[in-house]
């Protein structure tokens, strides 16, 4: 990326952000409510204790090895259910916070469930309208190119509110923030736009249409200085011109789909992030080679 930036082929001051949903390595039937998880945890602990007694009582070495393997599998089951219960507590805490801000919507939701296969993954709405265990992979790219600057798998079902946390991670990595940041309408969040304005970042994402059918670019009561500047920016021809370069980031997702990134074969956010990073590296190697060869031809 440093070489491409030095050649003027990419501009790290202008980034695009988009999300791609990829099926997780967890079954829809692996999701359990609190009562079921606690029951499974008690059963798993009973199995561990029973297997310990069997291994101690059986003097045969081969049978001991088989028993030890079964015992290890039972311990791993206990660990997974324990992790699921810990994750469930986080989900329940999030629901309690939502009750304070949007009580009607929170009350409509069913009792939270967590997967015993991969407690970190949530059920998300997919592009085909179905609901399946999946990761919301956030991809940051140099706007107007297919060069990936960063990847982060998230469990959030909505892109709203993900601009700030992703850019904070990018600042940790590169030591800087972009001057302009492009994202689709699903990322539009007043808090993120105000934060970006305070950091000197111009956000380009389409404003959401109001339920009354008014012009979404017109100022509204309660708008802060950052949101006011953003609405004015998106109403201008220059703002629309800048935003058009965001569309190219969709090509990255299409390329990864062609590489069969349909479903992750690993579990846990850290391992999923590693798979996404390998795809990003492969993507950047191919795209950088193409861009540098074109640059040499034009400068020859």
Identify the role of each PLM range.
Residues 1-300:
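Anion-binding and metal-coordination hotspots
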């Amino acid at each position: 990326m440093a070489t491409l930036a030095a050649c003027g082929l990419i501009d790290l001051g202008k980034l695009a952000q988009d999300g791609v949903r990829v099926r997780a390595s967890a079954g829809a039937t692996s999701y359990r409510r609190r009562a079921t998880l606690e029951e499974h945890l008690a059963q798993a602990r009973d199995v561990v204790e029973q297997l310990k007694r069997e291994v101690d009582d059986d003097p045969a070495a081969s049978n001991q090895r088989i028993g030890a393997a079964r015992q290890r599998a039972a311990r791993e089951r206990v660990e997974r259910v324990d992790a699921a219960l810990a994750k469930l507590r986080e989900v329940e805490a999030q629901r309690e916070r939502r009750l304070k801000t949007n009580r009607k919507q929170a009350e409509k939701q069913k009792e939270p469930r967590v997967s015993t296969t991969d407690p970190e993954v949530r059920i998300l709405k997919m592009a085909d309208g179905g609901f399946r265990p999946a990761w919301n992979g956030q991809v940051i790219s140099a706007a107007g190119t297919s060069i990936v600057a960063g990847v982060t798998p998230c469990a959030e079902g909505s892109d709203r509110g993900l601009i700030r946390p992703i850019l904070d991670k990018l600042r940790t990595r590169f030591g800087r923030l972009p001057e302009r940041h492009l994202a689709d309408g699903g990322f539009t969040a007043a808090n993120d736009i105000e934060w970006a304005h305070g950091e000197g970042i111009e956000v380009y994402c389409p404003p959401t249409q109001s339920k009354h059918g008014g012009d979404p670019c017109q100022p509204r009561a309660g708008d802060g200085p950052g949101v006011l500047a953003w609405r004015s920016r998106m109403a201008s021809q220059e703002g629309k011109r800048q935003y058009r370069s965001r569309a190219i980031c969709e090509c990255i997702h299409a390329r990864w789909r062609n590489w069969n990134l349909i479903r992750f074969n690993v579990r846990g956010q850290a391992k999923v992030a590693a798979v996404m990073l390998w795809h990003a590296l492969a993507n950047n190697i191919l795209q950088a080679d193409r861009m540098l060869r074109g640059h040499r031809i034009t400068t020859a």
